[in-house]
Amino acid sequence: MNSVSTSAFGPVAFSLGLLLVLPAAFPAPVLPGEDSKDVAAPHSQPLTSSERIDKHIRYILDGISALRKETCNRSNMCESSKEALAENNLNLPKMAEKDGCFQSGFNEDTCLVKIITGLLEFEVYLEYLQNRFESSEEQARAVQMSTKALIQFLQKKAKNLDAITTPEPTTNASLLTKLQAQNQWLQDMTTHLILRSFKEFLQSSLRALRQM
């Protein structure tokens, strides 16, 4: 596998992000992607919970964009006409009308459950990405750890935790083994589809969370 060069979303951003998100869900005064003045600047209002979620998701999206750029630069997967076939073999989370996240039929509680459940389902795919970027593994790790922190924070906002579905560890382990056993072309295509789908899911989540 060709290695991927490290972009601006690299070691420094990763190290800072990892230190901030590991202890708990957003326990530190400064989140990844935030400047300290955004949190407690003199003579200014600190960011609200919603604003911090917004900024945190955009931080993750920046990381995804960097990884997608590297993926597209090293292969033609972003332009492949065969991606629909590969996508049929994946079960990537998507937003639907019944999830209550769209403007029409918006339901805050139902939508929040969908967002959290979807993020939990994406975790196995983010784990798969950890072995796909030799030189940019820190970027993939930062996206993964920042997503874990986002899940923890959103779970604290949810009113109906019992409605949140958590994937079975054995199912995830089996899926991960299956993905890693694919041939090189399918692994490259899977990487592209995961990044694209996760970006779309986060963008939809961000729009919905701004209504909450």
UniProtKB/Swiss-Prot annotation:
Alphabetical UniProt keywords: Acute phase, Cytokine, Disulfide bond, Glycoprotein, Growth factor, Phosphoprotein, Secreted, Signal
Annotated signal peptide: 1-27
Phosphoserine PTM sites in chain numbering: 81
SUPFAM superfamilies on file: 4-helical cytokines
Membrane-traversing stretches: none
One MF term in the entry's GO annotations: growth factor activity
Main location: secreted
Sugar-modified residues: 73, 172
Protein's UniProt keywords contain Secreted: yes
Disulfide topology: 72-78, 101-111
Pfam family, one: IL6
Cellular compartment(s): Secreted
InterPro entries: 4_helix_cytokine-like_core (IPR009079), IL-6-like (IPR003574), IL-6/GCSF/MGF (IPR030474), IL6/GCSF/MGF_CS (IPR030473)
Record text on subunit structure and interactions: Component of a hexamer of two molecules each of IL6, IL6R and IL6ST; first binds to IL6R to associate with the signaling subunit IL6ST. Interacts with IL6R (via the N-terminal ectodomain); this interaction may be affected by IL6R-binding with SORL1, hence decreasing IL6 cis signaling. Interacts with SORL1 (via the N-terminal ectodomain); this interaction leads to IL6 internalization and lysosomal degradation. May form a trimeric complex with the soluble SORL1 ectodomain and soluble IL6R receptor; this interaction might stabilize circulating IL6, hence promoting IL6 trans signaling.
Family that this chain belongs to: Belongs to the IL-6 superfamily.
Function: Cytokine with a wide variety of biological functions in immunity, tissue regeneration, and metabolism. Binds to IL6R, then the complex associates to the signaling subunit IL6ST/gp130 to trigger the intracellular IL6-signaling pathway. The interaction with the membrane-bound IL6R and IL6ST stimulates 'classic signaling', whereas the binding of IL6 and soluble IL6R to IL6ST stimulates 'trans-signaling'. Alternatively, 'cluster signaling' occurs when membrane-bound IL6:IL6R complexes on transmitter cells activate IL6ST receptors on neighboring receiver cells. IL6 is a potent inducer of the acute phase response. Rapid production of IL6 contributes to host defense during infection and tissue injury, but excessive IL6 synthesis is involved in disease pathology. In the innate immune response, is synthesized by myeloid cells, such as macrophages and dendritic cells, upon recognition of pathogens through toll-like receptors (TLRs) at the site of infection or tissue injury. In the adaptive immune response, is required for the differentiation of B cells into immunoglobulin-secreting cells.
Name of the molecule in the record: Interleukin-6
Organism taxonomic ancestry: Eukaryota, Metazoa, Chordata, Craniata, Vertebrata
Gene designation per UniProt: IL6
